[in-house]
């Protein structure tokens, strides 16, 4: 059984050391280096740690430990130790997967191990980590730095009436950030279309007075949980995302008058006005999500032709309404971080 550990408690800290010390002693034999700092740790050092600990227990006895630190959506594994009695039983892999599963918003996971620690290198490689660099440490010891970039899961769920409330709440927060720079904030994307099945991500389009002024608010956006992505492939846009790989919000910002604003809004309003077409689109999204659950890019690419056709139909629909009413109507749509639609 794997569980999070309350390492501030002395009894738990002693249990952690009882696993850690023999594990690192074994590692010194493997790598031929006895200067591993963790071998000098005491109970008080474990208790004072800011890392989060999890442990693997068998029949109540702790035989494996993993700890990590997290900064926003970047996670660093600080230690992964298994008591020699638990070697080659899949305990290290289980602990690693536990951390990955409990940090779905992580965009990058880093771990460092001795280059000649063959068991550890094999474990991380099999788990999907890729070697990023080699670092020379004390006494000529070479360390391998591994990175894992977890894939975003494609999740399509039934329409939730609370999405509109989520938009309204976030809208008020963003108004406090950007203040008078904002001209208008629109709810776009599938969560803005009644009864539309969607990825549970609130897409927001913000019209601003000056797109060049947006970057001065990057730190405030970070404080609100957003990651600034700049243009991110679309000229004239400023894009922010929230929630890491467990995405919750996308913010697309354009300067007033940018044609992308009308394109996004027209697409939204076209689907709102045509429930049958929206239903057809929802069916396509569910099919693509089932076919490509681990590839957001393939999911987006699969929608591309449908969206292009719908956009052309939306333009004709708008033109027909303008001709009939003698006035200009509303519009809308949406966009993902890769330049494709999040819808």
Curated annotation (Swiss-Prot):
Q: Which UniProt keywords apply?
A: Acyltransferase, Transferase
Q: Does the keyword Transferase apply?
A: yes
> Which GO-annotated molecular functions does the record name?
acyltransferase activity, transferring groups other than amino-acyl groups
Pfam family membership, one:
Acetyltransf_1
Q: Which residues form the N-acetyltransferase domain?
A: 8-144
Q: Which Gene3D superfamilies match?
A: 3.40.630.30, Beta Polymerase, domain 2
Region described as UPF0157 = 135-343
The UniProt entry, under InterPro entries, shows: Acyl_CoA_acyltransferase (IPR016181), GNAT_dom (IPR000182), GrpB/CoaE (IPR007344), NT_sf (IPR043519)
By sequence similarity, the record places it as follows:
In the C-terminal section; belongs to the UPF0157 (GrpB) family.
What this protein is called in its record is UPF0157 protein YqkA
Query: What organism does this protein naturally occur in?
Result: Bacillus subtilis (strain 168)
Gene that encodes it: yqkA
């Amino acid at each position: 059984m794997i569980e999070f550990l309350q390492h501030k408690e002395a009894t738990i800290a002693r249990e952690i050391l009882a696993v850690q010390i023999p594990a690192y002693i074994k590692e010194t034999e493997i790598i031929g280096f006895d200067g591993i700092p963790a071998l000098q740790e005491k109970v008080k050092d474990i208790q004072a740690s800011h890392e989060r600990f999890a442990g693997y227990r068998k029949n109540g006895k702790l035989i494996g430990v993993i700890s990590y630190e997290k900064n926003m959506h970047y996670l660093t594994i600080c230690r992964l130790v298994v008591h020699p009695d638990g070697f080659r039983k899949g305990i290290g892999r289980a602990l690693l997967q536990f951390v990955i599963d409990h940090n779905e918003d992580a965009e990058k996971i880093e771990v460092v191990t001795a280059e000649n620690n063959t068991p550890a290198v094999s474990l991380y490689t099999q788990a999907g980590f890729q070697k990023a660099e080699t670092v020379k440490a004390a006494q000529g010891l070479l360390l391998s730095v591994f990175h894992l970039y977890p894939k975003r899961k494609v999740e399509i769920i039934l329409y939730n009436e609370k999405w509109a409330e989520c938009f309204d709440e976030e809208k008020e927060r963003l108004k406090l950030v950007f203040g008078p720079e904002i001209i208008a904030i629109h709810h776009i994307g599938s969560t803005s279309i009644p009864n539309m099945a969607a990825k549970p991500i609130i897409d927001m389009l913000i019209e601003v007075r000056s797109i060049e002024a947006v970057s001065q608010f990057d730190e405030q956006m970070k404080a609100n949980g957003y990651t600034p992505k700049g243009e991110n492939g679309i000229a004239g846009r400023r894009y922010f995302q929230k929630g890491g790989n467990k995405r919750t919000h996308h913010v697309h910002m354009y300067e007033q008058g940018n044609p992308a604003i009308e394109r996004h809004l027209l697409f939204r309003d076209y689907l709102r006005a045509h429930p049958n077409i929206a239903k057809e689109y929802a069916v396509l999204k569910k099919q693509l999500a089932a076919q490509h659950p681990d590839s957001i890019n393939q999911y987006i690419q699969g929608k591309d032709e449908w969206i292009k056709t719908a956009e052309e139909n939306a333009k004709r629909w708008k033109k027909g309404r303008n001709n009939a009413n003698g006035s200009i109507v509303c519009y809308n749509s949406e966009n993902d971080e890769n330049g494709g639609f999040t819808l």
